[in-house]
């Protein structure tokens, strides 16, 4: 914007402009047509000019590290990518994953931490799966068993110890169902699981028991992909692992916009100086990797420009996360805003280094060519 106020100190002029959002540095001799005088930008060695050009992006990323440290150090512990347990009706448990698996790659996307895992799974493609497959049958069977358990989970007259017995029966039975090799076996194990739950209820009349009906006709969407894990010290690739997929509401179902969710828990990482610094580094690097990957996918057509946000979208996002945080407390609101600011800061640093003429990345490329060939690129063709 236009200059409101300016003051010159030495060879530098400081200005306050009409829109004091961010800032910029204009150096003598960097623009086309300016004279190359002593002390101007183009009069210094090319190595020094390269350092000046990349300094802004480097500072953005370093600031991202500092803010990420402030965000990370508050946590009591951190999440790994090693599966510790599955929910009783976990779909991933019957499509390949096992307790103790350390997930290191999803559909070719390397997994460094839990944030990578969330990004990789949430961006998986989804396909329509027929309802008559063994995997879907086992999922519906475990869900039916959970339905039986839920009747007792709502019973306030049961003590925690009593309810735990019901849950143990459910968990043990679902684990067997997930390992079933056929629908018939899964059905038998479903009966066994339901009866073991009802057997804990002394007032239940077992003669009235009926096998829960399983819908095998309805097709459904499934997020799926190849997952590389470390199991018993060896890397193995599990093909077409299907993740728990659902519609958030009726509108999402009408528009065929399913959502993916985790149906397993991961082992915690103990908090100490080393893990705090390690999480800070890997989380920031993961954020940078996410930005670059998203740009590549944009070129490949996996994302559209409609999925990207400009200033208005960013402002809206900040407002939304702040409002969500305020529902649980002021500190959560501040942390939510801090996380968005980390994302924006790292984004700016990375995008600014893209090799386009209008960005620092384009200038860096020209200076790099000048350094290699010992000759500047002509400013005019």
Label every PLM stretch briefly.
Residues 49-62, 332, 339-353:
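Pore domain of cation channels
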Residues 12-15, 19-88:
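Internal alpha-helical transmembrane segments
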Residues 1-36, 351-373:
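Small-residue-rich helix-interface/hinge motifs
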Residues 93-115, 127-202, 207, 284:
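Conserved PDZ fold ligand-binding element
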Residues 40, 44, 149-156, 165-171, ...:
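Functional transmembrane alpha-helices
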Residues 16, 56, 92, 100-103, ...:
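Terminal peptide-recognition signature
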